[in-house]
Amino acid sequence: MKKLILSLCAMFMLLSASAAKKSVKIMTFNVRCVVEADGLNQWKNRKDYAVNLLKFYKPDLFGVQEATHQQMVDILAGLSDYAYVGVGRSDGKTGGEYSAIFYEKARFEVKDSGTFWLAEGEKANIPGSLGWDADYPRIATWAIFKDKKTGKSFFYLNTHLDHIGVQARHNGAKLLLDFAKSHSKGLPVVMTGDFNAEPTDDPILVLTQPEDKSFVLTDSKSVSKLVYGPEGTFHDFGRIEFEKRPRLDYIFINGKMSVKYHAVLTDNLGKLYPSDHHPVIAKIEFE
């Protein structure tokens, strides 16, 4: 009897370990750039809190938006187990905000990566390009990662759509969808970001309900087995009333995978917040 129990326990542990290896925790986190006018919530006051939040939730990979080079340095200094892919949007180097992807360097290998600008034609390859009616240059950073534990590879893209330009959001979303379709090489796809759009707005529908049904993104929240946290993700450091907070931050997927949970993380220390956006995290299991 003891042998049977031990065998069953061993089998359960092996199955649990196998499931854990296949699972990947992915986060999207608009960290809010450095603005002195933010007062209590300016970066120098919340950077340790933001880094500790990342240490606590331990995403395997996470995409950031609005991160300046100094913020990238600060985040990396606090997370020695991670590396990142990405560049600043102003010059393709360290100038301007990043839409970078951080990853656990012991677990993942970068097979390919790049950054492009959300702009028309050849402008997409020119650092600092403005697209359509955008107020700022907008970028997308992507990578093909190989999970060293499972041998599985997947395509990950992270972005931040413009907050002003209606055409820029619409055309930017189309560009993102087309790029993911043409560059993912049939691999599972994860797309994270601040899309500056709510679920029924045009940019989200471009991604989830395109005319060409051969490649469609799915909102991970809509298929998650467990949904935790509020609907809204942008709170402006707590200044927006809870019920009126818009949902702007998403984790989209395409391919053979299941979503174990999707959570909007509302951590705060009274009036001090890790950012003006809530981080969003999802646990995904590739089949």
Indicate residue ranges for each PLM-predicted region.
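Bacterial Sec-dependent N-terminal signal peptides
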Residues: 1-23
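Catalytic metal-binding/acid-base residues of hydrolase active sites
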Residues: 32, 68, 160-162, 195-198, ...
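Structured beta-strand-rich core segments of catalytic domains in phosphoester-bond hydrolases
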Residues: 61-153
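Active-site-proximal beta-strand elements of phosphoester/diester hydrolases
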Residues: 23-36, 99, 112-116, 152-162
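His/acidic metal-ligating clusters that form di-metal
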Residues: 137-159, 166-206
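N-terminal, active-site-proximal structural segment of metallo-dependent hydrolase catalytic domains
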Residues: 18-78, 89-97, 174, 287
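Active-site neighborhood of phospho(di)ester-bond hydrolases with catalytic His/Asp-centered motifs
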Residues: 63-65, 86-87, 190-194, 219-222
